[in-house]
A protein has these predicted regions:
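General small-molecule cofactor/ligand-binding pocket signal
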Residues: 57-59, 163, 200, 235
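Extracytoplasmic ligand-binding site segments that recognize negatively charged/polar headgroups
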Residues: 110-114, 120-210
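N-terminal Sec signal peptide cleavage junction
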Residues: 1-4
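N-terminal segment of the mature folded domain
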Residues: 6-147, 209-211, 222-230
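Ligand-binding pocket segment of bilobal, Venus flytrap-like solute-binding proteins
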Residues: 67, 168-260
Length: 261
């Protein structure tokens, strides 16, 4: 999707369909998902190599902000972990040169339930337990519901400190969809704004991992790359048939079943 102004212009196309971008100049601007920030950094470097006369900038302000800026015509494209709905698509079309708006799946980023708990290397949690933690019904790491899923693990009598995204976030949207689907009856909230009834908010993916990394007993949800970079532990998820770790194999298995609407 492309807005009217502030775009990189120039260049030509050859008869075989390949683009000759050597003469392209200008600024390509984008804004949105902080979970996509690392991928966008790679895209930016590749774009600069392919189009040395143009500049590409990405502002990782969160999916909600990226959608709003794109719809308002302030950026050339928005990065979002949640798609635009029909009304947003219509509004964006009206404000972007009357052209159709394209939504292109470009980045896959698994969401981890990341935590810091000194002395505990691995924890398994069920979707129901995760939902109860994030709405404040389970408050201690040695709660019976957690102990039941972690036989033989010495869980401390320590407060659980929930850290959530304070900005409008596609990661929040997807995490809440997961809870609502996988823990029916335990989670009612939805959307890019996470309920602020329990815990403390932090801005962006970098913000939540920074808070968790500095707080023993803390837990959050975040794109797995940020959790790994911050050296946070990632909970295995138990859907009733044993804990499933987040790794390349399990992510690959999930992607094999992925469908696009």
């Amino acid at each position: 999707c492309k807005s009217c102004d502030n775009s990189a212009d120039g260049g030509s196309s050859s008869s075989n369909g390949d683009s000759n971008l050597s003469g392209t100049t200008g600024q390509l601007t984008a804004e949105g998902s902080s979970a996509q920030q690392k991928a966008m950094s790679v895209f930016s470097a590749k774009y600069s190599q392919a189009v040395p006369g143009a500049q590409f900038s990405y502002n990782s302000t969160g999916s909600g902000a990226g959608q709003k800026q794109f719809i308002a015509g302030q950026v050339n494209f928005g990065g979002s972990d949640s798609p635009l709905d029909d009304s947003q698509m219509a509004e964006a079309k009206d404000k972007t040169c009357k052209s159709d708006v394209w939504q292109l799946p470009m980045v896959i980023g698994p969401v981890a339930v990341a935590y810091k708990l000194d002395g505990v290397d691995s924890v398994a949690l069920s979707p129901e337990v995760i939902a109860k933690i994030f709405k404040g019904e389970i408050k201690k790491w040695n709660d019976d519901a957690i102990k039941k899923l972690n036989d033989g693990v010495n869980l401390p009598d320590k407060d659980i400190k929930v850290i959530y995204r304070s900005d409008e976030s596609g990661t929040s949207d997807n995490f809440q969809k997961f809870l609502k689907t996988s823990a029916p009856g335990q989670w009612d909230s939805e959307g890019k704004a996470f309920p602020s009834t329990t815990g403390s908010g932090a801005n962006g993916s970098s913000g939540v991992v920074q808070e968790v990394g500095a707080t023993d007993g803390a837990i959050t949800y975040v794109e797995a790359g940020f959790a790994k970079e911050a050296k946070l532990k990632e909970a295995a998820i138990d859907f009733g048939q044993g804990p499933v770790e987040l790794n390349k194999e399990t992510v690959g298995n999930a992607l094999d079943k992925l469908t696009y609407k």
